[in-house]
UniProtKB/Swiss-Prot annotation:
Record's keyword annotation contains Hydrolase: no
Function recorded in the entry: O-methyltransferase; part of the gene cluster that mediates the biosynthesis of penigequinolones, potent insecticidal alkaloids that contain a highly modified 10-carbon prenyl group. The first stage is catalyzed by the nonribosomal peptide synthetase penN that condenses anthranilic acid and O-methyl-L-tyrosine to produce 4'-methoxycyclopeptin. 4'-methoxycyclopeptin is then converted to 4'-methoxydehydrocyclopeptin by the ketoglutarate-dependent dioxygenase penM through dehydrogenation to form a double bond between C-alpha and C-beta of the O-methyltyrosine side chain.
EC id: 2.1.1.-
The gene coding this protein: penK
Species for this entry: Penicillium thymicola
Binding site for S-adenosyl-L-methionine: 285
Broad enzyme group: transferase
UniProt-listed InterPro entries: COMT-like, O_MeTrfase_dom, Plant_O-MeTrfase_dimerisation, SAM-dependent_MTases_sf, WH-like_DNA-bd_sf, WH_DNA-bd_sf
Parts of the chain that traverse the membrane: none
Pfam families assigned: Dimerisation, Methyltransf_2
Swiss-Prot/TrEMBL keywords: Methyltransferase, S-adenosyl-L-methionine, Transferase
The name this protein goes by in its record: O-methyltransferase penK
Source species, domain of life: Eukaryota
Single GO MF descriptor: O-methyltransferase activity
Active site per database record: 325 (proton acceptor)
């Protein structure tokens, strides 16, 4: 671990970050956001489930204002709260996670009508204690003492995909995270590598990585994980075809190899979005059977381990969605090397669809996803500087020539080519 530079000192508080100035900035951001919502005929933010579960503005000003509201609110709370109490409450947040898991396991959300309330007497005594924690976090609301109703958050639990994602996080990830500190200590507090034990290994008492474990030891857990991934909003299927002009690949041979592409859901969406482009897609995954899918957006399915030599040479694009963030740097270098050796230097590119963390103010969700990846896989979310360092360390004459970012999130596609 590096030594502390004694010459470093915190900057003096400025008027811009003064307490009242923060409040002024918050009011301004709320005003801007409200105007954008009104202009797009969207309802104002509310906890009530009758409003849209997701209030997403399209205009850049509204997106930025929404980000500022959340960021400033958290900053004001952190500055206002007693620091000892703040640390204490923060250290107890795992109880919220366990309470939420109990509510999901008991399916409490099914007993509450969407447009009504349920009394505590209709719930188990234990559930009442759990509900106190969850209403404090506005997952549910207490209309009057002992009577509970849905909020926009709890109403999401009525949707299977959201429930599966939360169940995965509150079980697989929660258990893994509880042992991550032990795993890091065991590794001497070094960056995880492919061979080091992760929090997952200690929590589940296995030498297998997560992927091997859910494929062989616990396929039921693996099926839930697959369902959960359909509920992830970062790099959603609808965003991907709009992030990159895939139809332009027609001039470079038209072939897209979707590496680690699961059942081909991304490849199919790309073909559906560009129906007359002449594109072809081959989906490679370690757990598929060789063959082809049916329908107008048909893709070829090939079994392949991306740590082995890439058998398809000179494709227009080797596409990786949510692959690199699952693996530590040394594993990613192996994947990049195997892919680069199959590329044609004039027409091939590697397209990496993952998060690119903002250097100055990364989203809180992205920072937590980073620890998520570390606990389960030893992976990480990366800033642009970290992506550049990773690509450079792979050698093979690779370089990032473009980064196409989503205006709505930290999702992005990195366009990586061979230097000419």
């Amino acid at each position: 671990m590096g030594s502390i530079d004694d010459s470093f000192s915190l900057p003096a508080p400025s008027d811009e970050h003064g307490f009242e100035a923060l409040g002024t900035q918050l009011v301004e951001a709320m005003s801007t956001y409200a105007k954008c919502l009104k202009a797009e005929n969207l309802p104002p933010p509310s906890l009530y489930p009758m409003f849209s579960a997701s209030t997403s503005v399209a205009c850049p000003e509204g997106i930025e204002a929404k980000r500022k509201i959340v960021e400033l609110s958290q900053l004001i709370c952190a500055a206002t709260m007693d620091p000892e109490l703040n640390l204490l409450i923060s250290s107890l947040q795992f109880h919220f996670c366990s309470s939420l898991k109990v509510a999901i396991d008991l399916r409490i959300y099914e007993y509450i009508p969407v447009d009504g309330t349920v009394s505590l007497s209709q719930l188990a005594e234990l559930a009442g204690r759990i509900m106190r924690v969850l209403t404090n976090k506005h997952v549910f609301m207490q209309i009057q003492p002992g009577h509970y109703a849905h909020t926009r958050m709890s109403s999401l639990l009525l949707k299977t995909k959201a429930k599966d994602l939360l169940s995965h996080r509150l079980d697989d990830v929660f258990r893994s995270a509880s042992r991550e500190a032990d795993a890091l200590a065991q590794a001497g507090y070094r960056e995880p590598d492919r061979r080091a034990a992760k929090g997952f290994n200690l929590a589940f008492n296995t030498d297998k990585n997560f992927w091997e474990y859910i494929a062989t030891d616990d396929p039921k857990r693996g099926a839930r994980f697959a369902r959960a991934m359909h509920a992830v909003n970062i790099n959603s299927l609808d965003v991907i075809p709009r992030l990159y002009p895939f139809d332009s690949l027609a001039t470079d041979g038209s072939l897209i190899v979707d590496v680690g592409g699961g059942q081909g859901q991304v490849a199919k969406r790309i073909l559906e979005y560009y129906p007359n482009s002449g594109l072809r897609c081959i989906v490679q995954d370690g757990y598929v059977t060789n063959g082809s899918t049916a329908g107008p957006a048909a893709v070829e399915m090939h079994r392949h381990d991306f740590f082995e030599a890439q058998p398809i040479k000179g494709a227009a694009a080797y596409f990786f969605r949510h692959i690199f963030h699952d693996w530590p740097d040394n594993a990613c270098v192996t994947i990049l090397k195997q892919t680069a050796r199959a590329m044609d230097k004039h027409r091939s590119r590697i397209l990496i669809c993952d998060q690119v963390l903002d250097d100055n103010s990364p989203a809180e969700a992205s920072l937590l996803y980073d620890i998520d990846m570390m606990s389960l896989f030893g992976g990480k979310e990366r800033s642009l500087a970290e992506w550049k360092s990773l690509i450079y360390s792979a050698g093979e004459n690779l370089e990032i020539v473009n980064v196409l970012r989503s205006p709505e999130s930290e999702a992005a596609i990195l366009d990586v080519r061979l230097k000419l």
